[in-house]
């Protein structure tokens, strides 16, 4: 049995085990308002699937959260390059990045509500949560660049495009990819949390809040499952697209590295 197949069996067995624990806990409690069974949660999700509002909420939240991620990724790359070029930029940004990392998400959300509308809140919060993660990742990648290759490139006066492809991108992209894997999960959690507090109409966070105040525990679990699934699917898709882009720019050998 190969390692991949063995790993899949282990994951399946672990999933079955925890579903069994969930089912046993639901039976022991015996109150749907506190804990529904896995079958009830899935049944509620199946009921939501045909509803147009369900898909509209997904589109509303996904669009804004991914916009925040995209803006954070772009800004982090630009700021990381600027910090590498100028020490004063690094000195200015270091306390800001540390502050963003250390401040609770809820504090940012409440403060941001003073300045932005509820519908834009998830964009801003996703952006803020992604920025320090990818900034650190890009800085790490830049720092790992081969200095001997950089010296050779300078001696032979290679154009910027060739330097990027030969030295900088092979160093930065692996760290950036790893950072994106972490940042995508963070931006979904923080983005939905912003919606739960800001309550923009037609969002996933609004649906979660409504399920909570109406004691619709089945819907609460169903929407939670949707958030987890969306986060996993978008992470897989984005990383697959990023890998293809890396392969196209660097070639198969560079992509594997």
Residue ranges: model-predicted function:
Residues 137-176, 208:
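Short cytoplasmic-facing helical segments at TM-TM junctions of multi-pass membrane proteins
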Residues 87, 178, 222-257:
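C-terminal transmembrane helix and the adjacent membrane-cytosol boundary/short C-terminal tail
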Residues 2, 28-70:
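Periplasmic/extracellular loop-to-transmembrane helix junction in inner-membrane transport proteins
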Residues 98-133, 140:
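Generic hydrophobic transmembrane alpha-helix motif, especially the helices
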Residues 67-97, 110:
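Transmembrane-helix boundary motif in ABC transporter permease subunits
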Residues 179-229:
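Non-cytoplasmic
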Residues 5-29:
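N-terminal signal-anchor transmembrane alpha helix
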Residues 124, 128, 161-193, 222:
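Transmembrane alpha-helices
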């Amino acid at each position: 049995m190969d390692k991949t197949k063995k790993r899949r069996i282990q994951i399946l067995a672990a999933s079955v085990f925890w579903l069994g624990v969930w089912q046993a806990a639901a039976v022991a409690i015996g109150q749907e308002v506190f804990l529904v069974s896995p079958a009830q949660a899935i049944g509620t999700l199946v009921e939501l699937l045909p509803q147009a509002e369900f898909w509209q909420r997904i589109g509303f939240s996904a669009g804004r959260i991914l916009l925040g991620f995209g803006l954070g990724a772009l800004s982090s790359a630009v700021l990381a390059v600027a910090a590498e070029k100028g020490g004063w930029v690094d000195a200015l940004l270091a306390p800001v990045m540390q502050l963003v990392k250390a401040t609770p998400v809820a504090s940012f959300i409440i403060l941001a509500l003073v300045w932005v509308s509820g519908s834009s809140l998830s964009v801003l919060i996703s952006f803020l949560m992604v920025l320090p993660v990818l900034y650190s990742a890009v800085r790490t990648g830049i720092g790992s660049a081969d200095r001997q290759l950089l010296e050779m490139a300078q001696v032979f006066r290679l154009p910027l495009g060739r330097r990027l492809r030969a030295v900088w991108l092979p160093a930065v992209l692996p760290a950036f990819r790893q950072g994106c894997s972490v940042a995508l999960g963070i931006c979904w959690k923080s983005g939905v949390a912003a919606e739960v507090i800001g309550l923009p109409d037609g969002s996933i966070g609004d649906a979660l809040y409504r399920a909570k105040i109406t004691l619709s525990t089945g819907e609460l679990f169903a929407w939670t499952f949707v958030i987890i699934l969306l986060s996993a699917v978008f992470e897989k898709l984005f990383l697959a697209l990023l890998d293809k882009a890396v392969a196209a720019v660097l070639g198969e050998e560079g992509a594997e590295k």
